[in-house]
Amino acid sequence: IINFFESRTDDMVGVITFSNSAMYVLPLTQNKEAIKAAVNATAGNALFQTNIGAGLTSSAALFSGIADTGSRAIILLSDGAGRIDAPTQQKIKDWFSRFQIGLYWIVLRQPGGISIFDENFVPRDEEQPPPQIELYEFFKTFRSPFKAYEAEDPKSLELAIQDINLKEKKPITYTERLPGKNYSFGLLLTAMGLASLLLCLKILEVKSFK
């Protein structure tokens, strides 16, 4: 993940972590050292809760007030899923649409766990679908771009990151302040020329008066 961010030299990156609630780790920045430290800081253990709703709303809020100058995307990396209530779902959909944010969801799937891509999975009678299936169906209703991946090992995670890197190639528009040019020599010559002209006119005026 760090290699992915470091390879995208002009990107701004922010980091939000979440378990039972969301935590701002890093606002949007181009500081590669800060990004690396923020990603490394997520390596610790978390609480046994997954408040994805808080994570997504906090992540979308990072784009508030930021000019849209290129690709806008959130990479949701989670080893679990949680249920999101209806009002929060609507808020997430509205914000992602308003800020034109694409969503990439990388599911860190446990060996033998349920696959979100299993079309033949049927829950037991009177049971809700598993949270990850329910969340996948919700994400598919987004008006903004969405793609999901499953990663069971570092290699499959790397392949998912590579695919995201290929998809996020929208040109970035930015403003660059160019250093000004030194016009002092030219202005000095102009001033000397004008002074010489005035002196000549003064001499002619004196001769005419005489």
Regions found by a protein language model. Give the residues of each.
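VWA/integrin I-like adhesion module and closely mimicked acidic/polar interface patches used
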Residues: 80-141
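Von Willebrand factor
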Residues: 1-27, 52-56, 73-77
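Short, charged loop segments at secondary-structure junctions
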Residues: 21-54, 138-142
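Juxtamembrane amphipathic/hinge helix adjacent to a transmembrane helix
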Residues: 150-181
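C-terminal signal-anchor/stop-transfer transmembrane helix together with its immediate cytosolic
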Residues: 170-210
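Sec-exported extracytoplasmic/periplasmic mature domains
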Residues: 2-10, 40, 44, 60-68, ...
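Extracytoplasmic/secreted envelope proteins and their assembly/folding machinery
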Residues: 2, 32-40, 53-60, 89, ...
